[in-house]
Amino acid sequence: MHRIDETFRRLRAQSRKALIPFITAGDPSLEAAVPVMHALVRAGADVIELGVPFSDPMADGPVIQHSSERALQRGVGLAYVLQTVDVFRQSDAVTPVVLMGYLNPLEIYGIARFTQHAVACGVDGVLLVDLPPEEADEIRPIFSAAGLALIVLASPTTSASRLARLSGVAQGYLYYVSFSGVTGADRLDAQSAGDRLRGLRAQTQVPVVVGFGIRDAASAAVMAVDADGVVVGSALVTALSDAPDVDTACRRADAFLAPLRQALDAVK
């Protein structure tokens, strides 16, 4: 968790916005995972969200669903994801890594066992898109005691009372979903999202980042105005999806992310 906090403190001191790319572990290939993570950092990523493949990704659109399916067909499970972070940490002890996925794989693995292994491998936070509030209250103390942030989600349909509660318990950063729906949809409403983001940032002590609908440098810059950072997922996953080899995947990661970094650095 400390890596997340330190990263956002540094960015705030520099008046810069966080760039947070999402990739699915094991896609476009098993061999590409760690090299692509390093390529993203070189291109300007501040935090990496690493997707844990799941067979029923109900919050994800077709792009990430298919990416998850491809990874599962390659045998990717939670153990592989943790190993990926462990290998990444051998040459990057600074960049925060947040695992994003669903509750079921963690329950099968065992929450206590997962927490121990995740921290040992260098995971900084976990975002579970289908985590019920009552189970979050059970998991949060376990994660917190180990220094693992439980990242929470808010959306346009989240009630005011729920937002107030989320703002009080949020760790690492709060992830605001710019619209209700699945990942990869293309219906960004910057004005509405901006209003909500300003309210959230006034309510919570942690940084607020925004995701869903961010596809390129222009949309990233627009959404970053009222947020502490932006998350880009489906568009990046698409760019990587058919890379024939590791070198190509790394070049595509750099080519995709570098313009977003440049655009965000122009936002003050």
Swiss-Prot record:
GO cellular component terms, A-Z: cytosol
Domain of life from the UniProt record: Bacteria
Pathways involved: Amino-acid biosynthesis; L-tryptophan biosynthesis; L-tryptophan from chorismate: step 5/5
Catalytic activity: (1S,2R)-1-C-(indol-3-yl)glycerol 3-phosphate + L-serine = D-glyceraldehyde 3-phosphate + L-tryptophan + H2O
Keywords: Amino-acid biosynthesis, Aromatic amino acid biosynthesis, Lyase, Tryptophan biosynthesis
EC number: 4.2.1.20
Record-linked CDD domains: Tryptophan_synthase_alpha
PROSITE patterns per record: TRP_SYNTHASE_ALPHA
Any Pfam family the entry gives: Trp_syntA
Molecular function GO terms recorded: tryptophan synthase activity
Entry annotation: catalytic residues: E49 (proton acceptor), D60 (proton acceptor)
Broad class of enzyme this protein falls into: lyase
Functional description taken from the UniProt entry: The alpha subunit is responsible for the aldol cleavage of indoleglycerol phosphate to indole and glyceraldehyde 3-phosphate.
Family stated for the protein in its record: Belongs to the TrpA family.
Subunit structure and binding partners: Tetramer of two alpha and two beta chains.
Protein's UniProt name: Tryptophan synthase alpha chain
Native organism taxonomy: Bacteria, Pseudomonadati, Pseudomonadota, Gammaproteobacteria, Lysobacterales
Name of the gene encoding the protein in the UniProt record: trpA
